[in-house]
């Protein structure tokens, strides 16, 4: 979880990146959050479905990612939270908020 905020910090302070949309996409690409920009959603989804991912259901996520950004976010955050619950891991508060937000979105 910490590599996102650390990468954003380093990009800003070492590389001079000042675009908040880019920095936020870096910060939240593993947790998600309420109010994500289009770029943040794309990076979040891309990280989850990148080619080296081999988990059950990744092909379905890849398919929906080519069809509908909102549905892809819903599916990805659901999969992420379900995985954490199933493996009895702590869930970052922003991820819970993001999940709850997408429960209210129309499918």
Across the structure, where does each feature detected by a protein language model lie?
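Divalent metal-dependent catalytic cores for phosphoryl transfer on phosphate-bearing substrates
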Residues: 1-77
């Amino acid at each position: 979880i910490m590599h996102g905020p650390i990468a954003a910090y380093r990009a800003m302070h070492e590389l001079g990146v000042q675009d908040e949309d880019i920095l936020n996409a870096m910060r939240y690409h593993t947790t998600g959050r309420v109010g994500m920009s289009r770029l943040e959603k794309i990076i979040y989804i891309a990280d989850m479905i990148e080619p080296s991912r081999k988990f059950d259901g990744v092909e379905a996520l890849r398919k929906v990612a080519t069809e509908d950004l909102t549905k892809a976010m819903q599916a990805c955050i659901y999969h992420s939270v379900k995985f954490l619950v199933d493996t009895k891991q702590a869930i970052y508060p922003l991820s819970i908020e993001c999940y709850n937000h997408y429960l209210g979105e129309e499918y």
